[in-house]
Amino acid sequence: SVVVQAGDSQRAAQGTPVPVRPAVQVRDQYSNLVAGAAVAFAVDSGGGSVTGANPTTNGSGIATVGSWTVGTGNNTLIATVSGTGPVKFHATGVVPGAPKQLIVTAGNGQTGLIGYALNVPPAVEVVDSEGFPVPNKLVTFAVTGGGGSVTGDTMTTGTSGIATVGSWTVQLGANTLGASIPDAGVTNNPLSFTATGAAPDYDISIRPLTTMSPSRRAVFDSAAAHWERLIYGDVPDIPVNIPGDTLKKYCTGRTTPTLNETIDDIVIYAILDSIDGPGKVLGRAGPCYIRSSGFQPVIGVMFFDTADVASFPFDVVVTHEMGHVIGFGTIWGGRFLNLVVGPTTQGGTDPHFVGPQALAAFDRIGGTGYTAGAKVPVENCCTPGGGSNDAHWREAVFGDELMTSFLGATGVPKPLSVLTVASMGDEGYQVNYAGADAFSLTFAALRAQAGGGQAVPLVDDILRLPIGVVDARGRFVQWVMPR
């Protein structure tokens, strides 16, 4: 038998989904719950539509439609299981009345980097006296304080009743933005958003341990400045006093001065030396010491093979490896932030990054229709335990994105995408989405299809060093192997 489990007798604005998704429960002839039964949902009347029309029942015998969007007036939906049913759901599609209230739906109370758009564009919902969304209302957004600016200042509400400003760029200190409609008698009209503009306060200190030309040093400084535009918020300063021989043994592998200072926010040693000759390992990098609270790195090291620095785009490799020192792929694991599910080191075949900011950014760049596995796909291409797996975006999906495990062909851009920036937000950093390079999965797929030269694998570019953990006072806590 099949019975209604949830979602009958609802009301919703025409052209919008009902608030509770219809669900049925299936039992066999002995009243036992049936798992794995195929259920078909179909619109019976009213002119609405459904998504996820063919679910299967779960362990509780329940199957739920993806969504049911209603038309005007009376609507019915039927659910059928082979050999039984159908059962019917009812809903009323309401024509929204006049606007009665403006409601904040997104983007209030943010902090962002001055001179850049906030990560979440402010959005407002227009509703009638019953709380139903009102479509086709013109909403005007205007800066009311702080001296910032907006794009897309006049927007029209959709069927959801929501209008979203194109972007809101903030200046230092307090910023305010108003949203209004021309109708009279509307509560919260205008509606006010607040935001705080912050100056950049994340500092990367590059410490060369080998001789390098001014042009090579400039590449490191440029890469640091790039990351400092993307990670802008301060992290706790850490006072350290680490002997040079300890740094040599556990971090740099060479003579290193004693580090006796308060680190704000990370010190990165840079070394140009022979690794393994031309065309193999281009560089290796990773954190040497991390904070006990939050796990953000405080000291790290980057090695680059002198046999390769002139043969590949050095700036791209340095920017990539610096990302690993800061934490990309190196503090994701279960010993730290536990951001990767199904890593290849534990026998997984579809490792994926599960940070909420990255998941949202993946959809933003075109990942909503991704069906080849779980989101967000992490590299699984290579020998288990190798330096590429579980620590990069998956090359087969992301193509030329900077933080995949392959270096693109000469002349092919390697954009540092909003996905990578968002992943750093999941690591606990304050990040600036608007500083990311333009990137989409469609672009990545087209680039992969077009070819355009030989991609070079960034083989074993993650350092496998014990990572020292230090507390807020710089006291050593423990050594941890990265994975």
Q: Which residues does each predicted region cover?
A:
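Extracellular zinc-dependent metalloprotease catalytic-domain scaffold
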Residues: A198-T319, H324-R483
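The feature marks long extracellular or luminal low-complexity segments
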Residues: S1-A199
